[in-house]
């Protein structure tokens, strides 16, 4: 030992200086870590802060795992088939102990955090929400007087101490009855404080966040896990009691053989598999009747009553591999807990009867708790659906009472169905109204800004003006074949299409029979007359009349900007009156586009008529007839003979052309005479309303200033 000490000392003296602690101390990463840990060490934590809230969720999961872990110690004793002996599964014990140490570490961290977590003073709860006590000494005193004892009892590694230190040094009884009784007692004693730690933790989570589970399905799964936990505990207790029942039978039969004239005599040490290769035990096994008298499969033998524990031996549960053994015990606990223990065949033993009564009562309590909580969580997911069904039933009864036509009833049903599919019963306006102004503005900007920017007219505005518009947009839903705006009706809102298509048509074209129709798609808008009305600087409060009829071609989801909101924005932000926005509005307005189209068509037709008149005049100059001073026309026969020198071959063509031009000029002279008498001028006015051409007057220009 001294040589090992000298060797290690010499090796440490010869260590290179690059690995010295001084160099490690000057590491910037190390200094950063130390600064973080020092801040955490000196900081008092807020019980409602993010750190404590997240830790409570993590620790709740750790508590559930620890509650599932502790009953696994009941599966350590095993029975080797056909040998009448018991042993401990050491490998499985090491596995459980490692995870148990990790759980104990989390409980220790929880205790340390509680010494640093502030609390609300009871005297300050009279007015307001209360004040936090940040003094470390007061926090420690309060914790030591309240929950420290329970947390410490849940943290102590009692099962590890019993398995690895107490039981191996228990003398000749370390493989006998004390083994199972002591282990079971320790595990059950510490199982209680660990469960008590979880209850106030659950209440704190609900107090901090409002719910223990964030979703309905996770809440239902949480309650189902608790129910499986109880089944897990019952199954493991049933297993260890089955082992103890088998050991009790062997012990009784062994004592009988010890008192009888039986050679070799039975010894309680033979019931442990550690003496399996003992020659005395092997000789005893050849003549003993312990195995036959304690066989649960022997129906004719009435030496011992196994009662409800007989299935553990008839199905070879005690000698099966761990997973087969565990799932069978879990199924046994789940079956009897759900059936309130009705399938149990208990013996007359008082302990067995008490255990059966406990299973019955526990099944009644926990099964009712499971059904109630799962039903509450699942009802929260279908509550809005049930409300919608009630409203739909009320709507159907109202339509039947009012005797609405089938077409109207179908449209109402379609709208109710579409509104449910779009909103799922959520009142978005009520949710937004309950939020602070700044948060509501940011949410509206996130939801509407990208959609509003898709409207080319609003894309010309700055962010502040767009925020003011987005803040006042409200969702609007319309089903197929719904007339949103009718021509001649007051316009009370502008619609910005998000999804769907609408048809915008007008008959106001300056002549009878005029019709113009366009299709509005996502990114388009309608009701632009309202924008003109909002920008007019007069005191007229009457809403403008629509010049178009807007009808939905499919289900349409849009945002609506009401008249009073648009008027408020126009009055508050004078930038809406800029020439740039005026030109952008005229360019993207469908009303102005329709007017421009008709104006171009009318101008083109006037141009074609003037071109035809000029062509006719040119043909007149090239022809053989002329006009005298009185406006009469003369043919070439009335002209001097010197002008009749053309050949005979052109005479017939000239006569046909002359007849055609004569008819055209006759009609032109007649119209010229009528116009000359009415206006005192021979000029043709293509803009006169008597002309038979389509005409659409330009929309009224707003009085921009």
Swiss-Prot record:
Cellular component annotations (GO), alphabetically ordered: plasma membrane
Start and end residues of each stretch annotated as Disordered: 636-655, 672-705
Extracellular membrane side: 79-91, 169-180, 244-353
The name this protein goes by in its record: Probable cyclic nucleotide-gated ion channel 16
Matches recorded under Pfam families: cNMP_binding (PF00027), Ion_trans (PF00520)
PROSITE patterns on file: CNMP_BINDING_3
Subcellular location: Cell membrane
Bilayer topology annotation: Multi-pass membrane protein
Gene: CNGC16
């Amino acid at each position: 030992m001294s040589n090992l000490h000298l060797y290690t000392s010499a090796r440490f003296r010869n260590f290179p200086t690059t690995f010295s602690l001084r160099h490690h101390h000057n590491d910037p990463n190390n200094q950063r870590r130390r600064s973080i840990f020092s801040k955490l060490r000196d900081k008092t934590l807020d019980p409602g802060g993010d750190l404590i809230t997240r830790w409570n969720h993590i620790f709740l999961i750790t508590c559930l795992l620890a509650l599932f872990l502790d009953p696994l110690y009941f599966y350590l004793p095993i029975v080797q088939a056909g040998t009448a002996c018991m042993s401990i599964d050491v490998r499985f014990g090491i596995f459980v102990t490692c995870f148990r140490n990790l759980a104990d570490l989390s409980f220790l961290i929880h205790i340390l955090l509680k010494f640093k977590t502030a609390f609300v003073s009871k005297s300050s709860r009279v007015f307001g929400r209360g004040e936090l006590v940040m003094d470390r000494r007061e926090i420690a005193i309060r914790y030591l007087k309240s929950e420290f004892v329970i947390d410490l009892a849940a943290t102590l590694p009692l099962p590890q101490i019993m398995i690895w230190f107490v039981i191996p040094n228990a003398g000749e009884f370390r493989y006998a009855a004390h083994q199972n009784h002591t282990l079971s007692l320790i595990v059950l004693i510490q199982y209680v404080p660990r469960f008590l730690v979880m209850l106030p933790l659950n209440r704190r989570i609900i107090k901090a966040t409002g719910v223990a589970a964030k979703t309905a399905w996770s809440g239902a799964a949480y309650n189902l896990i608790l129910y499986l936990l109880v089944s897990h505990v019952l199954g493991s207790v049933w297993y260890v009691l089955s082992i103890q029942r088998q050991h009790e039978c062997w012990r009784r039969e062994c004592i009988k053989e010890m008192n009888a004239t039986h050679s070799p005599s039975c010894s309680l040490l033979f019931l442990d598999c550690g003496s399996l290769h003992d020659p005395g035990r092997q000789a005893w096994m050849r003549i003993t009747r312990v195995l036959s008298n304690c066989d649960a499969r022997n129906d004719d033998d009435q030496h011992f009553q196994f009662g409800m524990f007989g299935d553990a031996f008839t199905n070879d549960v005690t000698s099966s591999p761990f997973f087969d053994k565990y799932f069978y015990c879990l199924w046994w606990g789940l079956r009897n807990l759900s059936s309130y223990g009705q399938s149990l065949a208990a013996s007359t033993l008082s302990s067995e009867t008490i255990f059966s009564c406990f299973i019955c009562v526990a099944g009644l309590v926990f099964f009712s708790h499971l059904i109630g909580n799962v039903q509450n969580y699942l009802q929260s997911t279908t509550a809005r659906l049930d409300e919608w069904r009630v409203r739909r039933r009320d709507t159907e009864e109202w339509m039947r009472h009012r005797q609405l036509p089938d077409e109207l009833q179908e449209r109402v049903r379609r709208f109710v169905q579409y509104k449910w599919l779009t909103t799922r019963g959520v009142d978005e306006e009520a949710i937004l109204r309950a939020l602070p102004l700044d948060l509501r503005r940011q949410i509206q900007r996130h939801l509407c800004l990208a959609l509003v920017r898709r409207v080319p007219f609003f894309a010309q505005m700055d962010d502040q003006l767009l925020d003011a518009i987005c803040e006042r947009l409200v969702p609007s839903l319309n089903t197929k074949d719904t007339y949103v705006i009718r021509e001649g009706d007051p316009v009370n809102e502008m619609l910005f299409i998000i999804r769907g298509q609408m048809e915008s048509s007008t008959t106001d074209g300056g002549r009878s029979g005029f019709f113009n129709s366009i299709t509005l798609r996502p990114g388009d808008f309608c009701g632009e007359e309202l924008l003109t009305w909002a920008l007019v600087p007069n005191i007229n409060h009457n809403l403008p009349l629509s010049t178009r009829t807007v009808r939905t071609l499919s289900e349409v989801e849009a945002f609506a900007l009401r008249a009073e909101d648009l008027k408020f924005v126009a009055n508050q932000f004078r930038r809406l009156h800029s020439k740039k926005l005026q030109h952008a509005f005229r360019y993207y307005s469908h009303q102005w586009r329709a007017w421009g189209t008709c104006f171009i068509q009318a101008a083109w037709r006037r141009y074609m008529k003037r071109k035809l008149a000029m062509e006719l005049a040119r043909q007149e100059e090239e022809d053989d007839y002329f006009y005298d001073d009185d406006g009469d026309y003369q043919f070439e026969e009335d002209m001097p003979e010197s002008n009749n020198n053309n050949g005979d071959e052109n005479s017939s063509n000239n006569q046909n052309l002359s007849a055609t031009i004569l008819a055209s000029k006759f009609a032109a002279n007649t119209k010229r005479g009528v116009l000359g008498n009415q206006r005192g001028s021979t000029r043709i006015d293509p803009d006169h309303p008597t002309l038979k051409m389509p005409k659409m007057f330009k929309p009224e220009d707003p009085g921009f200033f």
